[in-house]
């Protein structure tokens, strides 16, 4: 597959100008779809592509019928619950406010705890709910004997930061801070920054996958050169700049004519660690810009991205929600099938949040 696959305006399916309303709506809709459909397969080591295709095709109503074929909505997980809480905080404060965001995360968990939250983050939220909590970043710093978490929880929810802030500097700053509320390891918050940057670039409409990767690599090589990032990677016995090395691997995989799912998982991962899932989501987006002989040609690029990302197995809901956010930001709402969207729990509120973000944060641009 050519590394410089075309990413032209025509390929965006009418998404419009950079940071258009269609892109905002597509971003959050794509993220919701990835979470809801991906949750069906979460934690399976292997996922049969035929099963995923059957699952999404069952969302389609009979020809001429509106809406979804499902009688019960596909439920979202903690991925969407936290992504929505993040957006709601940004809208309420019209800026990043760490105290408000931490409070909303914790209250969302308290209100609806059965969404699949991990044990570690539950401990953080319980501390946030305590009246004795004076520093909202301290509970995350105390995790894992003071080393902090390097899971993908900061990355899975971060898309709203990319929608709210238009400069690379702000995207990096607030992606880091929003992630550090629960993930204090640089291997965790750097993953959130990478995901936020990928959504940011997708919102602009880039010219090629090669350029897309080059920009991400430039940012991550700089970010991962700081002393804390080097130390955290070394303590885990990893290579220096683990995200940068995986971005380079993505470029190599895209150059190959044929890559099996097993190879992708072996090289990039499909786990709950941020470095085993964020690069994978980016690869899914870039790979699926071109047709896949195993996926029906009637599927558009966003649909292809979602199906392919879920077929990799592992942490399917989170990898698919991240890939869906990137693809939705790039291709826009025009590539979100109505029947798929309406199959998801909370799809109407998600769309309202996207429109509100665009109205509030685009007014000064």
Swiss-Prot record:
<protein>
    <recommendedName>
        <fullName>ADP-ribosylhydrolase ARH3</fullName>
        <ecNumber>3.5.1.-</ecNumber>
        <ecNumber>3.2.1.143</ecNumber>
        <ecNumber>3.2.2.-</ecNumber>
    </recommendedName>
</protein>
<feature type="binding site">
    <location>
        <position position="79"/>
    </location>
    <ligand>
        <name>Mg(2+) 1</name>
    </ligand>
</feature>
<dbReference type="GO" id="GO:0004649">
    <property type="term" value="F:poly(ADP-ribose) glycohydrolase activity"/>
</dbReference>
<keyword id="KW-0158">Chromosome</keyword>
<dbReference type="Pfam" id="PF03747">
    <property type="entry name" value="ADP_ribosyl_GH"/>
</dbReference>
<comment type="function">
    <text>ADP-ribosylhydrolase that preferentially hydrolyzes the scissile alpha-O-linkage attached to the anomeric C1'' position of ADP-ribose and acts on different substrates, such as proteins ADP-ribosylated on serine and threonine, free poly(ADP-ribose) and O-acetyl-ADP-D-ribose. Specifically acts as a serine mono-ADP-ribosylhydrolase by mediating the removal of mono-ADP-ribose attached to serine residues on proteins, thereby playing a key role in DNA damage response. Serine ADP-ribosylation of proteins constitutes the primary form of ADP-ribosylation of proteins in response to DNA damage.</text>
</comment>
<feature type="binding site">
    <location>
        <position position="183"/>
    </location>
    <ligand>
        <name>substrate</name>
    </ligand>
</feature>
<dbReference type="GO" id="GO:0005634">
    <property type="term" value="C:nucleus"/>
</dbReference>
<feature type="binding site">
    <location>
        <position position="77"/>
    </location>
    <ligand>
        <name>Mg(2+) 1</name>
    </ligand>
</feature>
<feature type="binding site">
    <location>
        <begin position="147"/>
        <end position="153"/>
    </location>
    <ligand>
        <name>substrate</name>
    </ligand>
</feature>
<dbReference type="GO" id="GO:0090734">
    <property type="term" value="C:site of DNA damage"/>
</dbReference>
<feature type="binding site">
    <location>
        <position position="317"/>
    </location>
    <ligand>
        <name>Mg(2+) 2</name>
    </ligand>
</feature>
<feature type="binding site">
    <location>
        <position position="78"/>
    </location>
    <ligand>
        <name>substrate</name>
    </ligand>
</feature>
<keyword id="KW-0496">Mitochondrion</keyword>
<keyword id="KW-0378">Hydrolase</keyword>
<feature type="binding site">
    <location>
        <position position="78"/>
    </location>
    <ligand>
        <name>Mg(2+) 1</name>
    </ligand>
</feature>
<dbReference type="GO" id="GO:0000287">
    <property type="term" value="F:magnesium ion binding"/>
</dbReference>
<keyword id="KW-0963">Cytoplasm</keyword>
<keyword id="KW-0227">DNA damage</keyword>
<comment type="subunit">
    <text>Monomer.</text>
</comment>
<feature type="binding site">
    <location>
        <position position="236"/>
    </location>
    <ligand>
        <name>substrate</name>
    </ligand>
</feature>
<dbReference type="GO" id="GO:0061463">
    <property type="term" value="F:O-acetyl-ADP-ribose deacetylase activity"/>
</dbReference>
<dbReference type="GO" id="GO:0004553">
    <property type="term" value="F:hydrolase activity, hydrolyzing O-glycosyl compounds"/>
</dbReference>
<feature type="binding site">
    <location>
        <position position="272"/>
    </location>
    <ligand>
        <name>substrate</name>
    </ligand>
</feature>
<dbReference type="GO" id="GO:0006281">
    <property type="term" value="P:DNA repair"/>
</dbReference>
<dbReference type="GO" id="GO:0140290">
    <property type="term" value="P:peptidyl-serine ADP-deribosylation"/>
</dbReference>
<dbReference type="GO" id="GO:0140292">
    <property type="term" value="F:ADP-ribosylserine hydrolase activity"/>
</dbReference>
<feature type="binding site">
    <location>
        <position position="317"/>
    </location>
    <ligand>
        <name>Mg(2+) 1</name>
    </ligand>
</feature>
<dbReference type="GO" id="GO:0060546">
    <property type="term" value="P:negative regulation of necroptotic process"/>
</dbReference>
<feature type="site" description="Glutamate flap">
    <location>
        <position position="42"/>
    </location>
</feature>
<feature type="binding site">
    <location>
        <position position="318"/>
    </location>
    <ligand>
        <name>Mg(2+) 2</name>
    </ligand>
</feature>
<dbReference type="InterPro" id="IPR005502">
    <property type="entry name" value="Ribosyl_crysJ1"/>
</dbReference>
<comment type="similarity">
    <text>Belongs to the ADP-ribosylglycohydrolase family.</text>
</comment>
<feature type="binding site">
    <location>
        <position position="315"/>
    </location>
    <ligand>
        <name>Mg(2+) 2</name>
    </ligand>
</feature>
<keyword id="KW-0479">Metal-binding</keyword>
<dbReference type="InterPro" id="IPR036705">
    <property type="entry name" value="Ribosyl_crysJ1_sf"/>
</dbReference>
<dbReference type="GO" id="GO:0005759">
    <property type="term" value="C:mitochondrial matrix"/>
</dbReference>
<keyword id="KW-0539">Nucleus</keyword>
<dbReference type="GO" id="GO:0005739">
    <property type="term" value="C:mitochondrion"/>
</dbReference>
<keyword id="KW-0234">DNA repair</keyword>
<keyword id="KW-0460">Magnesium</keyword>
<feature type="binding site">
    <location>
        <position position="42"/>
    </location>
    <ligand>
        <name>Mg(2+) 2</name>
    </ligand>
</feature>
């Amino acid at each position: 597959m050519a590394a410089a696959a075309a990413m032209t305006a025509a390929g965006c399916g009418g998404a419009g100008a950079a940071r258009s309303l269609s892109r905002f709506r597509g971003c959050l809709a794509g993220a919701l779809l990835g979470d809801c459909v991906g949750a069906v397969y979460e934690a399976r080591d292997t996922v049969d592509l035929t099963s995923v295709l059957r699952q999404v095709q069952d969302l389609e109503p009979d020809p001429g019928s509106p809406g979804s074929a499902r009688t019960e909505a596909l439920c979202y997980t903690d991925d969407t619950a936290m992504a929505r809480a993040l957006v709601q905080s940004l809208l309420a404060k019209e800026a990043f406010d760490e105290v408000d965001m931490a409070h909303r995360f914790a209250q969302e968990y308290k209100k609806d705890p059965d969404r699949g939250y991990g044990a570690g983050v539950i401990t953080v939220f319980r501390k946030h709910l305590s009246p004795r909590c004076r520093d909202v970043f301290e509970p995350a710093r105390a995790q894992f004997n003071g080393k902090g978490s390097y899971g993908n929880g900061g990355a899975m929810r971060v898309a709203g930061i990319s929608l709210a802030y238009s400069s690379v500097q702000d995207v990096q700053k607030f992606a880091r801070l929003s992630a550090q509320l629960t993930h204090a390891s640089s291997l965790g918050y750097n993953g959130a920054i990478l995901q936020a940057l990928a959504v940011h670039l997708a919102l602009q409409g880039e010219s090629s996958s090669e350029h897309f990767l080059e920009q991400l690599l430039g940012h991550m090589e700089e970010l991962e050169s700081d002393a804390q990032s080097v130390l955290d990677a070394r303590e885990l016995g990893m290579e220096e700049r683990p995200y940068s090395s995986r971005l380079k691997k993505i470029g190599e995989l895209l150059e190959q004519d044929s890559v099996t799912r097993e190879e992708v998982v072996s090289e990039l991962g499909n786990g709950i660690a941020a470095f085993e899932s964020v690069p994978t989501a980016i690869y899914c987006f870039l790979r699926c810009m071109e047709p896949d002989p195993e996926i029906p040609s009637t599927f558009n690029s966003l649909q292809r991205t979602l199906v392919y990302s879920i077929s990799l197995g592992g942490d399917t809901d989170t990898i698919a929600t991240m890939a869906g956010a990137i693809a939705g930001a790039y291709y826009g709402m025009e590539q979100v099938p109505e029947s798929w969207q309406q199959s998801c729990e909370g799809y109407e509120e998600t769309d309202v949040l996207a429109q509100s973000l665009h109205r509030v944060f685009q007014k000064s641009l």
